[in-house]
Amino acid sequence: MNFDVVIIGGGLAGLTCGVALQEQGKRCVIINNGQAAIDFSSGSMDLLSRLPSGEFVADFYKSYATFAKQLPQHPYSLLGKEKVLAKATQFEQLATSLKLDLVGSTAQNHLRVTPLGGLRGAWLSPNSVPTVKGSEPFPHKTIAILGIEGYHDFQPQLLADNLKQNPQFTHCELSTGYLNIPELDQLRNNAREFRSVNIAQVLEHKLAFRDLVAEIKTATKGAEAIFLPACFGLDDQSFFNQLQQAVEATIFELPTLPPSLLGIRQHKQLRHRFERLGGLMLNGDRALKADIENGKVQRIYTQLHQDNAISAEHLVLATGSYFSNGLKADFDRIFEPVFQADIVGCKDFNETDRLSWTANRFSSPQPYQSAGVAINEKCQVRKDGQFMANLYATGNVIGGFNSLELGCGSGVAVVTALAVAEEIVGA
């Protein structure tokens, strides 16, 4: 099989790159080995939340110079400020065309409410998620936080107790309660099946929609705003929007323990757009090895195509980090399993020195989290000291930064994905 571009990995980075390439007329295939990290995400995306020094980032544009000086090997530093902002804006436009219903911009980070009642910086968030701008007070004075009877992945009282500690919510009057939804009685018999996705699947049929609306109205007791777990609306926000109209109140939803409906919805919309544009998904397949000649990848072999290699003019490595097996670790080394690319990390990290992988304090940023493949300003992958002409990397498989520490994982994924798509189209 021959394609213009082979993309290894079907998560946020891989699909974003694939959509951008298909829109430019490239024939792409995505080798997808299962669920991606986006299926477990909060639905909010971060461009850059903190500097390596720990300082909170409100304005990416103003903070970039300091950031690039502190972390020159970060993909943002390699790409340059103007390109990063251009690609971030391009993704905002893509999200609008996909009807992902996101709010936010590169001009200023906002704060989103977490499932435990904290506030976390974000670049983009679903418009159904409660957010505040900086130190501004939350616009509603009375909030009803409602869980679902028997559903343990969302704790209203814990959320309320923590939410009160934030200055933006000190003026709010909070109440908590639980919804009794008889439709879910069958799920309660098996705790393993009583998850957000299962709940959404049952409620999607709307067999007792009016009863659900009445139950919410009764439980809110006239509150201006309602916080619910994200269990309403499987494929998109349409069910949630209908519920909000019927209740005639301002309803917000909060991500639950994984799997997360907010992330799953985004994943589905990206995948559907890629396939509608003519892209091919090889689901349940896994890249194993590649033939490399004269600094170029000639062909790739997968678990389901070990005898019939897949070839392409360009290849994109979008396999993610350890979570999705984009990186692996033995006792004495961290490595990228498909191309055996060069590994880099942050200061003092050595991929073959196990003692350098971890920090002494459990709560400190862990050096192994900064490991990933080495790239240049074109996102080309380095192997044996040389940059590959037709192999690019996007997302968290790239090394040299700790996305958890900096709050930049989603931003790196989409910015590098769109930058790589531009490089390939212009090649």
Curated annotation (Swiss-Prot):
Gene3D superfamilies: FAD/NAD(P)-binding domain
Cofactor or coenzyme needed: FMN
Keywords: Flavoprotein, FMN, Oxidoreductase
Reactions accelerated catalytically: a quinone + sn-glycerol 3-phosphate = dihydroxyacetone phosphate + a quinol
One Gene Ontology cellular component: glycerol-3-phosphate dehydrogenase (FAD) complex
GO biological process: glycerol catabolic process
Pfam families according to UniProt: FAD_binding_2 (PF00890)
Xref: HAMAP family: Glycerol3P_GlpB
Its biological purpose: Conversion of glycerol 3-phosphate to dihydroxyacetone. Uses fumarate or nitrate as electron acceptor.
Family note: Belongs to the anaerobic G-3-P dehydrogenase subunit B family.
Record-linked NCBIfam families: glycerol3P_GlpB (TIGR03378), PRK05329.1-1 (NF003718), PRK05329.1-2 (NF003719), PRK05329.1-3 (NF003720), PRK05329.1-4 (NF003721)
Name the UniProt record assigns to this protein: Anaerobic glycerol-3-phosphate dehydrogenase subunit B
Species this protein is from: Glaesserella parasuis serovar 5 (strain SH0165) (Haemophilus parasuis)
